[in-house]
Design a protein with these regions (language model features):
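Acidic, low-complexity intrinsically disordered regions
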Residues: 1-296
Length: 296
């Protein structure tokens, strides 16, 4: 039977290593067969410059699956805490980054693998898929909605005794009001940022957290943004100007830029950090904080 299914192109072997599991390809979720639009990086600007060691360390900790980071050796850690970015929050996915890779089930041949998450507190189990070629895990949208997570929320992943499952902890707490960045859709269809009081239900990263009251509006804004002909340089400057209005010093941290830019368009950290280094309009004021230089 297994040989017959292996020879039939309509079927995929989707079990983790050591488990035999077959699935009709057309019955696999669309987000498994095709990369969700929110995860696609489309900018073609080429810019080459060396990142500082500080920036490289931040890039590693951002767990972006598009980052080209060499894995020196297989990690033996038993748990990792990652920060949920807007693209993955919207698509219901998780990145398979260098730090996350050792937690994710693998197969000897298949690039699409079905496995299970187990919620740490409730012990509730739910299915997910890893698409190793494109380095993401699909199937968490309902989980994010159930726990009312926001982009910037922290997730703890733990190794399970069962190689086909991963323990996931949303690190939730009683809802409380916090002043956090909030993305709003303007009359022109573009996005703007404001600091507003919002309900928060889980632990979060201060520089990554963002509330999105109008998700459908942001979807339209992303579509509109994708049609503009501006360069990455111009688009980064527009986001930096908007973010700089949120504090009296006008400083923007590189991590804040990464979080905000990925709301409107998918981009890994390195191209954004390179813009901060190469564009003379920005001055590094320390600890990866940048400000826009006044001209004229």
């Amino acid at each position: 039977m297994n040989f017959a299914l292996q020879e039939d192109s309509r079927f995929d072997e989707v079990g983790p290593a050591g488990q035999v599991l077959w699935c009709l390809e057309r019955l696999e979720p669309e987000g498994v067969r095709e990369i969700p639009s929110e995860l696609k990086f489309t900018f073609s600007d080429e810019l080459c410059c060396d990142l500082s060691e500080e920036m490289k360390a931040l890039e590693l900790n951002l767990d972006d699956e598009l980052s080209e980071i060499e894995q020196q050796e297989k990690s033996q850690v038993k748990e990792v805490i990652i920060c949920l970015t807007y693209p993955h929050w919207r698509a219901g996915t998780l990145p398979v980054s260098v730090r996350v890779d050792s937690f994710i089930p693998y197969a000897y041949e298949s690039e699409r693998i079905r496995f299970s998450f187990v919620e740490a507190k409730s012990k509730e189990e739910f299915p997910a898929w890893v698409v190793r070629k494109n380095r993401y895990v699909y199937g968490l949208k309902d989980f994010y909605d159930q726990h009312e997570l926001l982009p910037g929320s922290l997730l703890r992943l733990r190794v399970s005794k069962d190689p086909g499952t991963i323990i996931i902890d949303p690190m939730t707490h009683r809802p409380k009001k916090e002043w956090i960045r909030t993305v709003l859709v303007g009359r022109d269809g573009g996005i703007v940022f404001a600091t507003l009081k919002q309900s928060v239900t889980a632990e979060f990263n201060d520089r990554m957290i963002v509330a999105v009251p109008d998700v459908a509006g942001v979807d339209v804004a992303r579509e509109q943004f994708a049609k503009n002909k501006k360069t990455l340089k111009d688009n980064v400057f527009a986001i930096m100007k908007d973010l700089s209005k949120l504090n009296l010093q006008g400083h923007v941290h590189a991590q804040e830029l990464y979080s905000a830019f990925n709301i409107i368009s998918r981009c890994p950290p390195a191209p954004l950090f390179m813009q901060l280094i190469s564009d003379p309009r920005y001055t590094h004021v320390g600890d990866l904080h940048f400000r826009i230089e006044e001209t004229g």
